[in-house]
Curated annotation (Swiss-Prot):
GO terms for molecular function: ATP binding; single-stranded DNA binding. This is DNA replication and repair protein RecF. Co-immunoprecipitates with DarG in the presence and absence of darT. It comes from Mycobacterium tuberculosis (strain ATCC 25618 / H37Rv). It comes from the Bacteria.
């Protein structure tokens, strides 16, 4: 798989650009702040419908405009597929597949399969649980695009249920008991969609675990052994150890956990149980990586998580596109060499670098130089001829 064309309109610092890309390695070179990462971000958005840098879409739209467009042509086994994504201010985002409108942007997920390595990856080890949950969900969505709808529906139900919890004090004051009947309805829906999301994550962690261990050993052979596990906000004993996860059992346990925390939730006005409270646990030896891993160990573990994702996608069938955003600058010589070796099998590798010295020695790659120009509308990124 490779991206043959990337077109941007009013995306971040890019007013207008059309890039013809090729299989093999391409390096986007330019000083920091010139817009290199925005190219990688656009491709990652096309992969997961989300940015790896911000949680909202608004910052992706160029200042002074009301919409951004990302256009890609992806080649997979000789077959071309065109995707256009429109990110809009104040209205629903739109998508087209092979120039035809689709019902939801989620319908284009899976066309581009990519793995992203970025400086933000250190947050997978040292950051909040939300960073690790997003890692799992993004990978699950790339492998099984239907998970995007599951997550979206879970988040919708979670918002509705949280709003209802916050309204309970007022309902009690008015003597309105119907709010509790409504809460039970939302409990059932949260348990249904939450169980499906948790099942997908547990299944993914079970497959990732041996790959993370192998990748970390390659990157840090002198360090302790790496391991991962899934920590849920409810009892998942049994299902987490099974290859065929019982979603009905998970839903029943989630429903029971919601009932057990009902009083605390009503008091605080927040949902205390569900996949939005879960975490991916990372360990080195018998210690949690967060707080105990050195800087080098943390980077090795972060890269190992991405390499494990890459390996799973390869096993699924087809080489995913590798997106390397300034990551070589963050790694020492040994880790650079290990990552470069792993990238050799990819059909396409797209890399950003502030200076060419950040690229591993001996890497044969096309070079695309990025600059910044100014006009009446402000500064914008451009590709140098």
């Amino acid at each position: 798989m490779y991206v043959r064309h990337l077109g941007l309109r009013d995306f971040r610092s890019w007013a207008c650009v059309d890039l013809e890309l090729h299989p093999g390695r391409t390096v986007f070179v330019g000083p920091n702040g010139y817009g290199k990462t925005n190219l990688i971000e656009a491709l990652w958005y096309s992969t997961t419908l989300g940015s790896h840098r911000v949680s909202a879409d608004l910052p992706l739209i160029r200042v002074g405009t009301d919409r951004a467009v990302i256009s890609t042509i992806v080649v997979n086994d000789g077959r071309e597929c065109a995707v256009d994504l429109e990110i809009a201010t104040g209205r629903v985002n739109k998508a087209r597949l092979n120039r035809s409108s689709v019902r939801s942007t989620r319908d284009v997920v899976g066309v581009l399969r990519a793995v992203l390595f970025a400086p933000e990856d250190l947050g997978l080890v040292r950051g909040d649980p939300a960073d690790r949950r997003r890692y799992l969900d993004d990978l699950a969505i790339v492998r099984r695009p239907a998970i995007a709808a599951v997550r979206a529906e879970y988040e919708r139900v979670l918002r509705q249920r949280t709003a209802l919890l916050k309204s309970v004090p007022g309902a009690r004051y008015r003597g309105d008991r119907g709010v509790f009947d409504t809460l039970e309805v939302w409990d059932s829906r949260l348990a249904e969609h939450g169980a499906e999301l948790v099942a997908a994550r547990i299944d993914l962690v079970n497959q990732l675990a041996p790959e993370v261990k192998k990748a970390y050993q390659l990157l840090a052979p002198e360090s302790r052994s790496a391991s991962i596990g899934y920590r849920a906000s409810m009892d998942v004993t049994g299902p987490s150890e099974q290859s065929d996860i019982d979603r009905q059992l998970l839903a029943a346990r989630l429903l029971a956990a919601l009932a057990a925390r009902r009083d605390a939730e009503l008091e605080r006005g927040v949902c205390l149980v569900g996949p939005h409270r879960d975490d991916l646990i990372l360990r080195l030896g018998d210690q949690p990586a967060k707080g105990f891993a050195s800087h080098g160990e943390a980077w090795s573990l972060a890269v190992a998580l991405r390499l494990a994702a890459y390996q799973l996608l390869r096993v699924d069938g087809g080489e995913p596109v590798l997106l390397l955003d300034d990551v070589f600058a963050e790694l020492d010589v040994m880790r650079r060499r290990a990552l470069a070796t792993a990238a050799e099998s990819a059909e396409q590798v797209l890399v950003t670098a502030a200076v060419l010295e950040d690229i591993p020695a001996g890497w044969d790659a096309r070079r695309v130089h990025i600059d910044v120009r100014a006009d009446d509308t402000g500064s914008m990124s451009v590709v140098l001829p």
